[in-house]
UniProtKB/Swiss-Prot annotation:
This is Formyltransferase/hydrolase complex subunit D. Optimum pH is 7. GO terms for molecular function: formylmethanofuran-tetrahydromethanopterin N-formyltransferase activity. The gene is ffsA. It is an enzyme of class 2 (transferase). The keyword Nucleotide-binding does not apply. It comes from Methylorubrum extorquens (strain ATCC 14718 / DSM 1338 / JCM 2805 / NCIMB 9133 / AM1). GO terms for biological process: formaldehyde catabolic process; one-carbon metabolic process. It is found in: Cytoplasm. GO terms for cellular component: cytoplasm. It catalyses: N-formylmethanofuran + 5,6,7,8-tetrahydromethanopterin + H(+) = N(5)-formyl-5,6,7,8-tetrahydromethanopterin + methanofuran.
Length: 311
């Protein structure tokens, strides 16, 4: 393998290794975009990594009233877990504690898929026997079941069940090697904006960016993951460092999506956006994280992402 350049920036001839995950989507609506976003922001908090948070979540899109089941402003949220049962547990907890509790919200299924997850059908028990089931047609005329749960500002309307998809992928990634922190952060921010514009893809870390990239295991017994020392600039003098002398900071983006194709397109968009402005911000190189191809079956080779994203 030989490295190559894109927009004058070195790109390592490597691949990002990603994993099969369970994924779902919900639509949260409210009377105003502000309150729909408040609910979505709270629900997707503490959801950067499945390992430490139980789920990975993010906001996929803001929706106009024409795009939602009840004709109000909305937000589409994506949620990912290791497997369907863990995903169900996180979905119920987060909707119950963050969407049910928020003034004015309603909650609907946001994606079709083969696996059913009871949502309103489980949360209805909060209604203490006063919740009422109702069937209403969707935009295609298909009857769907909802629960009207009495709450102090009226009622919480929640779809009886949502769906989990087959083919969701977690862990697409890019690493940006830069000279200075402020400049590299700008590059990563531009990459995030491009990546999250792809429908069905989210970047779950703070602002879409992670500084604490990890490797599997560690020196301490029982650690599932520890700092990726090969990419820590303060350890450049040690054997095993993967960083060139001029690199002073590394920032990573991680992408989860409902399909493998969405991960690839999100990575492509991020790679091109970052390298287009990289030279003026001291970007040294772009690479990706993998485990030698031994853990995840999805391999996204950076060489395959050279073609520009569709306009």
């Amino acid at each position: 393998m030989s490295d190559f350049t894109l927009n004058g920036i070195k790109v390592e001839d490597t691949f990002a290794e990603a994993f099969d995950v369970a994924g779902t989507a919900i639509i949260v609506t409210n009377d105003t975009p502000k309150w729909a976003m408040i609910a979505a922001t709270v629900m997707t908090g503490f959801a950067t990594s499945v390992i430490g948070c139980g789920a990975e979540a993010g906001i996929d899109a803001e929706l106009s009233p024409d795009e939602t089941p009840d004709g109000r402003p909305g937000v589409r949220i994506l949620l990912f877990g290791f497997e369907p049962n863990g995903l169900k547990d996180q979905l119920l907890k987060r909707v119950g504690q963050c969407i049910l509790t928020c003034p004015g919200t309603a909650c609907f299924a946001g994606v079709e898929g083969p696996t059913k997850i009871k949502l309103g059908g489980a949360i209805r028990y909060f209604g203490d026997g006063f919740a009422v089931a109702k069937r209403l047609p969707d935009h295609e005329g298909k009857m769907r079941r909802y629960w009207r749960i009495p709450v102090m500002d009226g009622e919480f309307l929640c779809e009886d069940s949502v769906r989990a998809v087959d083919g969701a992928v977690g862990g697409g990634n890019l690493l940006f090697l830069g000279r200075k922190h402020a400049d590299t952060l700008i590059v990563a921010e531009i990459a995030v904006e491009a990546a999250k514009a792809i429908p069905g893809a989210i970047l779950p870390f703070p602002g879409g960016i992670v500084r604490s990239g990890s490797k599997v295991g560690g020196r301490t017994k029982g650690m599932m993951a520890s700092t990726n020392d090969a990419y820590c600039p303060t350890l450049k003098g040690r054997a095993g460092s993967a960083l060139p002398p001029e690199c002073g900071v590394v920032l990573e983006i991680v992408i989860d999506a409902l399909t493998s194709a969405a991960v690839a397109e999100s990575m492509r968009a991020a790679l091109h956006a970052a390298t287009e402005i990289g030279a003026q911000h001291g970007l040294v190189a772009v690479t990706a994280g993998n485990y030698g191809g031994n853990l995840g079956r999805h391999h996204y080779h950076l060489r395959d992402l050279l073609e520009k994203p569709a306009a």
